[in-house]
């Protein structure tokens, strides 16, 4: 029974990924920039950001909510910024601290990544906020990723706060998810900031002190 359910979930997710990628690729560049700016402004004003001293963030591609201004602002604000790098030969990733966008170079899937410098590996200290990429999120904070599992594996070990950035047109009422999927705590679109961890049935997120 579970095998059939998992198969159905994978099939539904695959269809959603295709349609949402298409939707995002057709966004007018000027409209996209306006939405990116609005989402960025909301994030930078949020307590999730102001109370953090470490920002873990994806490096945006063309169809994603841009994170460049977030990275630049966090560095100017004196916060430590770390970006992900895929580990060769696996579906794991590690975060490395950066001091400039110039340190990021195209690598896995053409995404810009930091160098694998052991001295700059994210050390799980401080008060981090992790900005999680997603093609779609639902109102409870569950996400539709790209299907590779990199963030799923990282989030299973990560104990800090999480936020998803998404265009409101890509938000679903409810996404299919498994029992090991971890929802984000906050969801920000160009229209609203949703406190997913406070409204989610059963409060299914990570418990923190």
Predicted regions and their residues:
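Surface-exposed, charge/polar-rich loops and edge strands
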Residues: 2-11, 22, 115, 125-130, ...
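N-terminal active-site beta-alpha-beta segment that forms phosphate/nucleotide-binding
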Residues: 2-125
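Residue-level signal for inorganic ion chemistry
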Residues: 20, 81, 131, 147, ...
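Receiver (REC) domain switch-region micro-motif
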Residues: 55, 130-131
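Glycine-rich, N-terminal phosphate-binding loop of Rossmann-like dinucleotide-binding domains
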Residues: 59, 134, 191
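Short glycine-rich anion-binding loops that position phosphate/pyrophosphate groups of nucleotides
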Residues: 61-63, 135-139
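Charged helix-capping and loop-helix junction motifs
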Residues: 72, 144-150
């Amino acid at each position: 029974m579970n095998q059939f359910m998992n198969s159905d979930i994978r099939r539904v997710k695959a269809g959603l990924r295709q349609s949402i990628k298409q939707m995002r690729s057709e966004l007018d560049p000027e409209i996209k920039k306006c939405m990116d700016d609005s989402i960025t402004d909301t994030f930078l004003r949020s307590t999730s950001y102001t109370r953090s001293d470490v920002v873990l963030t994806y490096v945006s591609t063309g169809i994603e909510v841009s994170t460049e201004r977030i990275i630049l602002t966090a560095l100017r604000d004196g916060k430590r910024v770390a970006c992900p790098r895929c580990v060769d030969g696996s579906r794991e990733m590690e975060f490395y601290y950066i001091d400039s966008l110039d340190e990021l170079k195209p690598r896995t899937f053409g995404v810009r990544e930091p160098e694998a410098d052991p001295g700059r590996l994210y050390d799980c200290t401080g008060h981090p906020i992790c900005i999680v990429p997603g093609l779609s999120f639902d109102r409870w904070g569950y996400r539709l990723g790209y299907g590779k599992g990199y963030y799923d594996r990282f989030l299973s070990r990560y104990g800090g706060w999480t936020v998803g950035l998404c265009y409101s047109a890509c938000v679903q009422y409810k996404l299919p998810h498994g029992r090991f999927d971890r929802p984000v705590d906050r969801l920000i679109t160009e229209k609203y900031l949703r406190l997913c961890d406070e409204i989610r049935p059963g409060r299914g997120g990570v418990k923190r002190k």
